């Protein structure tokens, strides 16, 4: 209460910032008459003037009013659009590294031109980040007219572009691209063998469009570049034949009484955590089935150490068959499994689930099973975007996630007021007992809208649900358009005309982003088609355009009079923000509109989180079938359930980041070292330091520091030098012939001998040629060991939560052990590189060149396969894929015995619970 009182008294921080920014808006507006008088050439010359002032030390903040005024004037001349004052406010928020929340239809794309232009003046490049290639291409092509007019270059960064084109795109003043492609380019740049092969410049400033989608929805999805690992294709096929013979248990047993199971079965499905667990009965059934299939020996246990990989494949098959559904979580396209993004409904071509899940789904659908992959490089979007010197974002829905943006990224969210107040009527949810009743009510609403000519956008959470609505509308003979991941290519065309009178458009979440739904239809697309028609004379073209605009005005006014665009949603999403995005399609720029959610107690969110409470209310009210409950208390109850899910997902993302920060720090060290190796013209000193460290470590194993001669093992040292580096050094005879010799002198003799062997190779081949070979060896060693290190960190993370049972802090233990693994990695690189360079037999420059080329080709081959990782289904550190427990050979642990790890849990609930 005290906080609310103070906010009313002094205004919120958002209000105070807006008040401060409005003073700058007044200054920009005052400049407008002067800039209107400038010729096109004089206006363009301002860009060069600004660049020179920045080069002399003037700050971008000082230039802001003038730069914004120039962009506004340029837009008026080229785009025929003038930035509203609220767009200037949004541009300032973006320049100052904030997230600007601007409602749908407020012109975020045009708003971004202001800070993009200003920050491009520094010459360090600006990256505009979009959610898909279509938007990157559209926005770059659209806005390039303005930027080029003002003297700035624009590049588009798309997948599969040749390296030279990517370099040109990144060297432009402004680069448009997707979050995935920027991240992949960063990883690829840190895997190249020639410095000239890198494409990115310094990561200076990025504006992330639809920032909530990229930095929150995708935060748990790492970008992964991977190479093929061992093939287990036959195993996935075999497991897919076994799983259908297992029966799902209905009901959940109470841990105290054992009651609650309505139908016993072999496995349970936990929809909240998105996991599957074998029951005791299922464990025995699986053993029996695997025994019949000859996959485990007679009398052997499924949880014997030798069968741990079987358990992994069994659980992958169970999850594929019971948690992942066709046309909801994935589609089958051209004989491949393509993941459907749960937040946008878009197809994620090239992305694969990890941990064998994707292969299990491929086996289930009977398509070609592709080999599993080993991670070669990875980074989360959270850590990639934190590499930028300055980061900003814009979206229509950020306020509900403002705390997370501040906590994780240090980004403040600023709500920009609309140019015109919204007239949308967001009606209370209607909740029905069954799915059938819900759909019947939604169809009635759609029919009523259609009969009066009001356009309708029907929102669904999955392709499956959109196809159900599609069938129902076909039965009712109601003409409509379907927009889901299967019609991705037609997205813009369908959405552009969704505001025409009588239009019915069914859409998954993907329709929420990027394209405005204009009442009366998108006239600009139609005008563009006429302007491109070369068969028309100029007079005919103008006449036709004028007629089209007049017709559009009639349709626009008609739709407005009918209440604008009607949003009908058939399910609540887990996130309030996604629901708000759907609502936000209606009521743009002060247009009228309305929205209504039709729900049932069978919906996933209701069933898992809020169904019992609402069902109890319905039973108390003795509501007949077909009647809906429509009350604020129900809507608030549903939003409360959504808040719980959002809080849980935030905790998962935050925990992921805390663990990933450890590997992120190590990644920075490795990539910095890699870049130094690539950029160095001579590596002799670096190799010398490495070699001396390795030689010293070896010598000290046989001749400890400050030790007596009696403690030395010179015979062992001679043998080690011969076997490790082919150095023949008669240390024993030298010591015997000397009157007195110290351990330091022994060390110096060995170092000198190693130096002479190495220098002889360098002299034979030539320093420059040998530098190339050294570079290839160093990079190959770093890459191989980094790849193995990433796998080791994954295994460590999966089992680290067990330390909690020993009263240890898992995160601290993870940091400590990860550091030790990293130290071992560095030592291993030094040892490997020294061994290769000391033992390689070279007789000519040609041999060195061939060896260098072979190393580089091996690296290039490993880059051929690239894929996405998928988000973890369990909490980080609490994943059900625990670190396998090593048991003595032949040892067997009963399912209900205490786990040998010492956790105090039963084996089936601890290391026996593998997926």
UniProtKB/Swiss-Prot annotation:
Function comment: Part of the Sec protein translocase complex. Interacts with the SecYEG preprotein conducting channel. Has a central role in coupling the hydrolysis of ATP to the transfer of proteins into and across the cell membrane, serving both as a receptor for the preprotein-SecB complex and as an ATP-driven molecular motor driving the stepwise translocation of polypeptide chains across the membrane.
Positions contributing to Zn(2+) binding: 899, 901, 910-911
Organism phylogeny: Bacteria, Pseudomonadati, Pseudomonadota, Betaproteobacteria, Burkholderiales
Subunit structure: Monomer and homodimer. Part of the essential Sec protein translocation apparatus which comprises SecA, SecYEG and auxiliary proteins SecDF-YajC and YidC.
Record family assignment: Belongs to the SecA family.
Biased composition (Basic residues): 905-915
GO biological process terms held by the UniProt record: intracellular protein transmembrane transport; protein import; protein targeting; protein transport by the Sec complex
Stored SMART domains: SecA_DEAD, SecA_PP_bind
Keywords from the UniProt entry: ATP-binding, Cell inner membrane, Cell membrane, Cytoplasm, Membrane, Metal-binding, Nucleotide-binding, Protein transport, Translocase, Translocation, Transport, Zinc
Top-rank EC class of the record's enzyme: translocase
Ranges for region Disordered: 866-915
Protein name: Protein translocase subunit SecA
GO cellular component, one term: cytosol
Cofactor, free-text remark: May bind 1 zinc ion per subunit.
Gene3D superfamilies (alphabetical): Helical scaffold and wing domains of SecA, P-loop containing nucleotide triphosphate hydrolases, SecA, preprotein cross-linking domain
Protein residues bound to ATP: 87, 105-109, 516
Record bears the keyword Cell inner membrane: yes
Places the protein is found: Cell inner membrane; Cytoplasm
Domain of life, source organism: Bacteria
UniProt EC number: 7.4.2.8
């Amino acid at each position: 209460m005290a906080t609310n009182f103070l906010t009313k008294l002094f205004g919120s921080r958002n209000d105070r910032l807006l008040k401060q920014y409005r003073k700058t808006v007044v200054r920009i507006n005052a400049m407008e008459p002067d800039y209107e008088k400038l010729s096109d050439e004089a206006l363009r010359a301002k860009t060069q003037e600004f660049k020179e002032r920045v080069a002399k030390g003037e700050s971008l903040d000082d230039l802001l009013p003038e730069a914004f005024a120039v962009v506004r004037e340029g837009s008026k001349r080229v785009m025929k659009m003038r930035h509203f004052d609220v767009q200037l406010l949004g541009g300032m928020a973006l320049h100052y590294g904030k997230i600007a929340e601007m409602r749908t239809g407020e012109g975020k794309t045009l708003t971004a031109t202001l800070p993009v232009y200003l920050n491009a003046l520094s010459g360090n490049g600006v990256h505009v980040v979009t959610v898909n290639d279509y938007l990157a291409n559209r926005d770059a092509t659209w806005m390039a007219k303005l930027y080029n007019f003002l003297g700035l270059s624009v590049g588009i960064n798309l997948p599969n572009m040749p390296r030279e084109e990517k370099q040109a795109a990144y060297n432009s003043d402004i680069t448009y691209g997707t979050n995935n492609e920027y991240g992949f380019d960063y990883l690829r740049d840190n895997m190249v063998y020639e410095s000239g092969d890198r494409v990115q410049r310094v990561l200076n400033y990025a504006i992330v469009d639809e920032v909530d989608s990229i930095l929150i929805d995708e935060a748990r999805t790492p970008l992964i570049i991977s190479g093929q690992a061992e093939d287990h294709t036959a195993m996935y096929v075999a497991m897919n034949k076994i799983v259908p013979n297992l029966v799902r248990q209905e009901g959940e047993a109470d841990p105290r009484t054992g009651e609650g199971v309505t139908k016993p079965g072999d496995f349970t499905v936990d929809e909240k955590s998105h996991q599957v667990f074998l029951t005791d009965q299922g464990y025995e059934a699986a053993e029996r089935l695997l025994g019949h299939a000859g996959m485990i020996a007679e009398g052997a246990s499924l949880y014997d150490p030798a069968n741990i990989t079987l358990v992994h494949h069994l659980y992958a098959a169970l999850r594929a068959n019971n948690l992942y559904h066709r046309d909801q979580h994935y589609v089958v396209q051209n004989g491949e499994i393509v993941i459907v993004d749960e937040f946008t409904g878009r197809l994620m071509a090239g992305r694969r689930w990890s941990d064998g899940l994707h292969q299990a789904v491929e086996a289930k659908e009977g398509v070609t099973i592709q080999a599993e992959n080993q991670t070669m490089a990875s980074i989360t979007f959270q850590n990639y975007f934190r590499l930028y010197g300055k980061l900003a974002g814009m979206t229509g829905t950020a306020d509900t996630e403002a705390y997370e943006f501040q906590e994780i990224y240090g980004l403040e969210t600023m709500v920009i007021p609309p140019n015109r107040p919204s007239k949308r009527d967001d009606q209370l949810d209607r909740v029905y007992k069954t799915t059938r009743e819900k759909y019947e009510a939604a169809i009635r609403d759609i029919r009523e809208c259609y009969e009066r000519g009001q356009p309708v956008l029907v929102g669904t959470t999955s392709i499956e649900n959109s196809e159900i609505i599609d069938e129902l509308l076909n039965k009712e003979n109601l003409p409509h358009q379907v927009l889901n991941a299967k019609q991705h290519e037609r997205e813009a065309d369908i959405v552009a005309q969704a505001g025409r009178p009588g239009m019915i458009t069914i859409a998954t979440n993907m329709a929420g982003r990027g394209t405005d739904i204009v009442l009366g239809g998108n006239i600009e697309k139609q005008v563009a088609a006429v302007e491109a028609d070369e068969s028309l004379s100029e007079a005919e073209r103008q006449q036709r355009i004028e007629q089209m605009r007049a017709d559009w005005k009639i349709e626009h006014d008609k739709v407005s009079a009918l209440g604008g665009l009607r949003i009908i949603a058939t399910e609540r999403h887990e996130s309030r923000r996604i629901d708000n995005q759907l609502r936000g399609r209606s009521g743009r720029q002060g247009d009228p509109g309305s929205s209504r959610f039709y729900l049932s107690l069978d919906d996933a969110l209701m069933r898992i989180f809020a169904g019992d409470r609402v069902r109890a209310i319905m039973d108390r009210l003795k509501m007949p079938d077909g009647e809906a409950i429509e009350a604020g208390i129900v809507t608030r109850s549903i939003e409360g359930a959504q808040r719980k899910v959002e809080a849980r997902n935030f905790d998962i993302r935050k925990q992921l980041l805390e663990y990933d920060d450890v590997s992120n720090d190590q990644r920075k060290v490795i990539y910095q070292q890699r870049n130094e190796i690539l950029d160095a013209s001579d590596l002799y000193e670096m190799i010398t330091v490495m070699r001396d460290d390795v030689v010293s470590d070896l010598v000290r194993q046989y001749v400890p520091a400050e030790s007596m001669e009696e403690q030395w093992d010179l015979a062992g040292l001679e043998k080690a030098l011969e076997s490790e580096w082919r150095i023949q050094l008669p240390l024993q005879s030298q010591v015997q012939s000397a009157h007195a010799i110290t351990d330091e002198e022994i060390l110096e003799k060995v170092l000198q001998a190693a130096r002479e062997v190495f220098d002889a190779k360098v002299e034979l081949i030539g320093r420059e040629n040998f530098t190339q070979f050294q570079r290839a060896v160093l990079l190959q060693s770093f890459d191989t060991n980094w790849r193995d290190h990433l796998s080791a960190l994954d295994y460590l993370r999966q089992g680290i939560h067990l330390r909690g049972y020993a009263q240890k802090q898992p995160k601290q233990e993870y940091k400590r052990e990860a550091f030790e693994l990293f130290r071992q990695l560095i030592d291993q690189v030094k040892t490997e590189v020294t061994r290769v360079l000391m033992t390689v037999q070279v007789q000519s420059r040609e041999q060195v060149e061939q060896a260098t080329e072979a190393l580089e080709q091996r690296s290039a081959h490993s880059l051929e396969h690239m894929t996405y990782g998928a988000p973890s289904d369990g909490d980080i550190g609490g994943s059900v894929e625990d670190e396998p427990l090593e048991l003595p050979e032949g040892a067997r642990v009963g399912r209900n015995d205490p786990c040998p790890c010492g956790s105090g849990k039963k084996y089936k609930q601890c290391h026996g619970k593998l997926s």
